[in-house]
Regions:
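Short, well-ordered beta-strand segments
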Residues: 1-3, 80, 132, 212
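Extracytoplasmic "Venus flytrap"
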Residues: 1-19, 33-43, 138-142, 190-195
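Short, polar/charged alpha-helical segment
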Residues: 11-32, 147, 151
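An alpha-beta-alpha
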Residues: 18, 106-153, 254-271
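Beta-alpha junction/loop-to-helix N-cap segments that form part of ligand/metal-binding clefts
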Residues: 34-96, 190-214
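Hydrophobic alpha-helical segments within soluble ligand-binding/sensing domains
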Residues: 87-128, 229-250
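Pocket-lining segment of extracytoplasmic ligand-binding domains
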Residues: 140-209, 215
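Hinge/cleft segment of the Venus flytrap/periplasmic-binding protein
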Residues: 244-288
Length: 288
């Protein structure tokens, strides 16, 4: 059973990677049930409860609210998360980076090196002074990323200010304030931002303020550059973990959290052109 929080580019890619890994191993012998929560965590619980009632062999929880719903619903069915930034925060545990969670939960993380994303701001905008940190306050993983990146950026001499929005309803207004007060904006890996990147773009492009994004999907919608993991890849890694579990080769309880170690500097040529920016040659065009 696959529970995906909402349909946007990054999460869709993770689901596809997962399914491709299962199909490569099992062909048509695997039955996949999919549920999309439409961005509502309450729907995640309903979808997961259905999977538990059907006694599925494994659950893929795509994004943090899906994972927390699955963890609450069963302690026996193997659960693999994907597109979850920090499992410790998601599950109220101690830091779990590179660790085995134990129990019935493991998965893959979409956390990119935040220090290197801060370095990207310095590389591309060395003369900027004010960096706006735009994020959804309702997403614990976004708060974690913002706190971490702020520390790196302030250590480089930037003045940082947080611009938190509650949901899509105040996103445009908060983005406008950030654009008015910032030389450059950083947006972390954030589901609300990813699902509404065009709303951010409609503000920052006319304002002439560049966005450094935490992942490729957001960058493709409103950013100029990102250092991004591949969501397809972390989905595929989760799928390969699922194959091992379903074949009885390995227990979920002994599996460490998986990461995509292949990182690419990517840029959005369209928005760069609109803002009059030229990217260094080692930046690859998104979709190119």
């Amino acid at each position: 059973g696959i529970c995906q929080l909402l349909p946007h580019t990054a999460l869709n890619a993770a689901t596809e990677g997962f399914k491709d890994a299962l199909k490569a191993a099992f062909g048509d012998a695997v039955e996949i049930k999919e549920g999309n929560a439409g961005g509502d965590p309450a729907n995640c619980a309903t979808i997961i409860d259905g999977f538990v009632a059907d006694n599925v062999d494994l659950i893929l929880a795509n994004a943090t609210p899906s994972l927390t719903a699955a963890a609450s619903a069963t302690d026996t069915i193997p659960i693999l998360g994907t597109a979850v930034t920090n499992y410790g925060i998601a599950l109220n545990l101690d830091s779990t980076e590179d660790k085995v969670l134990g129990g019935n939960i493991s998965g893959t993380s979409d956390l990119a090196p935040l220090d290197q994303q801060a370095d990207m701001v310095k590389e591309l905008f060395p003369d900027a002074k004010n960096v706006g940190l735009l994020y959804c306050t309702a997403e614990a993983n976004s708060v974690y990323q913002i706190e971490t990146v702020q520390g790196y950026l302030e250590g480089m001499g930037y003045t940082c200010k947080r611009y938190g929005f509650n949901d899509v309803n105040d996103l445009a207004a908060v983005t406008q304030t950030a654009a008015d007060e910032s030389d450059v904006i950083y947006v972390p890996t954030d589901n609300t931002a990813a699902d509404n990147a065009s709303t951010i773009a409609d503000v920052v492009i006319p304002a002439g303020v560049p966005v450094i994004a935490g992942e490729e999907g957001i960058c493709g919608g409103c950013g100029v550059a990102t250092l991004s993991i591949s969501y397809y890849e972390i989905g595929q890694i989760a799928g390969e973990m699922a194959v091992q579990i379903l074949k009885g080769e390995k227990s979920v309880s002994e599996m460490a959290i998986g990461f995509d170690t292949t990182l690419d500097k990517k840029c959005n040529p369209t928005i760069c052109e609109q803002l009059g920016l030229t990217m260094p040659e080692d930046y690859v065009a998104i979709g190119g």
